[in-house]
Amino acid sequence: MALSINSEGNDVAKYVAARGVTGCVLKYRLAHTGEDATQEFGAMLADGQKFHEMLGKVVPLAVADGLAAVTYVRQHASEWGVSPDRVGIIGFSAGGAVTAGVAFHYLPEGWPAFVAPIYAGGEMSKDASVPVDAPPMFVAAATDDQLGLAPESAALYEKWTSAHKSAELHLYAKGGHGFGMRKQNLPTDHWIDRFADWLELQGWLQK
């Protein structure tokens, strides 16, 4: 597997940094692949059983990395001039699954101020309960997602709101999987602006 480190990582960090938010990009553990990760991933998707076996092995490790990252940033926030109570997490696709995992399984020292799973799978959150002190959630996905993750994204939103927790959902008609910060001349081009609007609404863009 591979990380989409630019359109779903560095570019997002640069966008929020321009609005006064410190962005950290996490490289979490992935399934082992050869040189052509895209080709191998496509073949794995064609074999549903093999794909889910892979997820069962790697997702817990990736979520553990996400949990550790939030805790680490909170513990070192004061050194970097960041408030530990304003540390949140956003992730896309597999990173969205990491974000969802953090949303459900954090410990007090790793409490995220907000969570934003974008076109996320929820392998570790399907049977999990919403935490009592769950943070606000922002969710976005495209209905024509090739991996079929729009329903899972909607399910995350529904689970949050059913527990009477704050959540916002954006489901786009088109955009496919992995739209991230890529420009496609579609409404998904502006999801990041809706995310910024939501951050401002929550008070996270105010110093």
Predicted regions and their residues:
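Serine-hydrolase catalytic machinery in alpha/beta-hydrolase-like enzymes
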Residues: 1-80
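C-terminal catalytic histidine-bearing segment of alpha/beta-hydrolase fold enzymes
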Residues: 39, 140, 161-207
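Primarily recognizes the serine-hydrolase "nucleophile elbow" in alpha/beta-hydrolase
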Residues: 60-133
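Generic structural signal for well-ordered alpha-helices
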Residues: 67-70, 157, 196
